Amino acid sequence: MPSGGRGRPRLQVGERSLLERPSPPKRRLIPRAQLLPQLLLALTVASVFYTIWRIWHSQTEELPLGRELRGPLIGSLPEARVRRVVGQLDPHRLWNTFLRPLLVVRTPGSPGNLQVRKFLEATLRTLSAGWHIELDSFTASTPVGPLDFSNVVATLDPGAARHLTLACHYDSKLFPSDSAPFVGATDSAVPCSLLLELAQALDQELGKAKERAAPMTLQLIFLDGEEALKQWGPKDSLYGSRHLAQLMESTPHGLGSTRIQAIELFMLLDLLGAPNPTFYSHFPRTARWFHRLRSIEKRLHRLNLLQSHPWEVMYFQTGEPPGSVEDDHIPFLRRGVPVLHLIATPFPSVWHTSDDSEANLHPPTVHNLSRILAVFLAEYLGL
């Protein structure tokens, strides 16, 4: 996931053509007695139109452009509900049950990769909400020879019209055999454990949403082969996301739609777990949802529901990101999917080193992120 600036196209204003000199307007003298009623009538009509315009504008100004116009108009949870959602999260379970089994070398095609993939599947199958779990398995040519990859796709209700999709990659980067073991704690064991904890903590609410056939459902995607095997490039990276996006684009979903068109919002989690992360909105289309996360962070801080979180370490920042990032969202973004990229930028100092381990994680940050995301999911899905 190399970072670097990428030019953004700017809208260019065309030259205005010269206008011919207009002919002098015809005038007529209006007696003063007739002028006042006409002015009052004009002001009344203008006031009515202005009121109508303001009502319409207030209802639409917060809506982004494009496919996301059909997104839900969500409201904030009452304080009691916020506290209940946060209370359903279990920091011990997140860390010991979900995270630690992922902290192994898990390069594509390795025994560790298979072990982690089976762990993800088994964990999702234990949830009472009843997830529909699919494997997208394929073989791809790589710089180190043909390799087998498998994406894990868990959809709460496959029949729902729209999907809120949370994604992360579960493979770890390949290093020379004489290198120290690389377990990729932030990259991306922590994101995977966050997804599992969210599904477990909200299990009952998600099950009820499925029973009532809510039009919006939750989808979790665990991608294989994000990391380059030799050198990052368009053919040596994003193996799993490239394959899955193409597959979803060609798979029908409902009448006249495809599975990729069913994704209303694609949230990609990456490089999470180091202390004091900063996140930025990378795409105007999803800025609305980024600012919702920022608002939730502020609210949880005010309610004293975040740990080791003074105001000066706010995670969700305003302003431009330090640079663009190539990651698993790219194949989906290119197909028109709205993307919210939750990645720490600048990258953690341990990025792509053997120090990206459990010892260098910051537990309060991990648990704070789980709380922010849990409230976001509860609000977005109406749980």
Curated annotation (Swiss-Prot):
Statement: the UniProt record of this protein carries the keyword Magnesium: no
Keywords associated with the record: Acyltransferase, Disulfide bond, Golgi apparatus, Membrane, Metal-binding, Transferase, Transmembrane, Transmembrane helix, Zinc
A Pfam family it matches: Peptidase_M28
Enzyme Commission number(s) of this protein: 2.3.2.5
CDD domains: M28_QC_like
Family: Belongs to the glutaminyl-peptide cyclotransferase family.
Functional note: Responsible for the biosynthesis of pyroglutamyl peptides.
Gene Ontology MF annotations: glutaminyl-peptide cyclotransferase activity; zinc ion binding
Membrane topology designation: Single-pass type I membrane protein
Main localisation: Golgi
Residues bound to Zn(2+): 187, 227, 352
Disulfide-bond pairs as recorded: 168-192
GO annotation terms (biological process): peptidyl-pyroglutamic acid biosynthetic process, using glutaminyl-peptide cyclotransferase
Positions of region (Disordered): 1-25
TM region(s), chain numbering: 35-57
InterPro entries: M28_QC (IPR037457), Peptidase_M28 (IPR007484), QC/QCL (IPR040234)
Gene3D superfamilies: Zn peptidases (3.40.630.10)
Native species: Bos taurus
GO cellular component: Golgi membrane
Protein name: Glutaminyl-peptide cyclotransferase-like protein
Localisation per UniProt entry: Golgi apparatus membrane
Highest rank taxon of the organism: Eukaryota
Lineage: Eukaryota, Metazoa, Chordata, Craniata, Vertebrata
